[in-house]
């Protein structure tokens, strides 16, 4: 028993470091795609700003993890009813099963360059692992084991997260269309007149996002300031809008500098919020397991304080992953290409569903054109029609990058303020896709491939929950039934899976085409093995 506990604790801490590495590699798409896609700065500068945001967010994190993960499972089911003491082996099985499954799942998505939600994955893994432990350690069979899950909150979390996908896509498409309608593609001409308004709105959205999502739950802001921000969002937005709008007015003839500043601020802001709030998704299970073993009388229904040294170590690992992982580039490349301007080389092939949706869109567009006055259609086309692409054009322009960041930040802030469950990955990805549609960068020639790629990512999100819950169920079952040997089997399965994915996709340290470079990506199915046999003439992104 003691040997199994010791081995399990060591394994879960080691897996936490791997989980940080693969988690950042996948979530990097949240705060890198806009800056990289618009080439707002050099790659080193963008990475440095994102790394600074991550490091600052890690150091100022509150370090609290809700052990029961917002009511996913009933923690009292894993305590001794007579003494109230934690059943250590059961808790270790739950959290080790979660960590083992999470590492494999995130690395699988990273290998094929697909973004997924770490929030959905960890919630689903907690569901699967807790059911497995309850099944094998309590009487009553599967029916009784299922009662360990609090189905109402779990279904609410899933529903809220997937509804945010639709909201992010439609709102970003509408806002981008309106922004382009006002600014046109001749931004140097229109920005001096109305650019200060968009500057103020963008800065206000990002500042509010930093304050509310990034800092209100940290140690940096005094409680009274955090309370004021939560209670007075309109005042906070107004206080941010006025000076930002003034800066935009004073710099109205330097639109590139203003837009780049917004993009880089948004990049650092998303990095800060990610580390400050989502960091504990990766190290929380390890901290909770260590507390259950080492701290007498710990209550699973409470919050677990994370030591400062653990936060610092986690921040270092996250920054290292951001700089070193080529899989992070692969995931970012997927989103940048799907949202890029012009006939960009895509990773995905057409399929029947994408073709049917495109044909349906053609029919709807014909109806819209039939009821739209000709003069209005001509005027809208003159203001929103994209110009012919150039050879050195970035995947998307600076204005669209600011829309991506501002819409994502605003939606995340609103959801957080209203305590709505959401996924930053889903919102940032769908905001970028919606903005691309609203900016009219899709063409009928490549619409099916773009839509097939979006459907592939959406399909991956749908199966994330199933894969995460199933994987955690299997891992936790191995640990509960096998004891020390079960721990070895679970860790061995993770090692074999990681090695296998590295062999399939090539070394993680192998340099691939950077996002926006224009070089064609490797085939998404077996990216390295068939790459040489499928090479085509390089096409610059955005052409």
Q: Which residues fall in each region the model found?
A:
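Alpha-helical transmembrane segments and immediately membrane-proximal extracytoplasmic
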Residues: 2-420, 425-543
